[in-house]
């Protein structure tokens, strides 16, 4: 629904404020409320350093070329990725911890609305050009409410690399969380499931070193109050 130009146009008339939050992992904490257009928010302490290392070690043997929505290999995304499920004995506890933090922030606790966690590795020169995590015009519109990604919790598993920031292109904001920290942003409207221009973002090219991140996606459910 929103391309890069539409996103830029929207934000020329929008007042956008970066929301920096230092949140505890207390499950009793109320859901993070963000006003339209759902500015990205920093999230501190999602994982420990040891958990980041373990998740990387678990994902490494199964890495494959990253794909875009529709299971397509594209020059727009040149990283490698692996999927990790909450049921896996060696790393499932880490997936569950990431999901729990995403649930705490979004107010969504239904397991069926969480995808597997996607672990991504970016080597030198690798990137993910500006894109939306939600379903775009090429998707099956009839299935869109079921498959659309409502929110993204992006966790940085390393921070010892050069460049490679997450760039929210429409508002000109670059973020580079510390290892174990993340950024939360909404991809779709809570009521309609339509894509939000605020979520347009890119993984900029890594200059040197290796960047590892983990994506946790919460899907849109038109019957739910928040997602």
Residue map of PLM features:
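Fe(II)/2-oxoglutarate oxygenase catalytic core
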Residues: 1-227
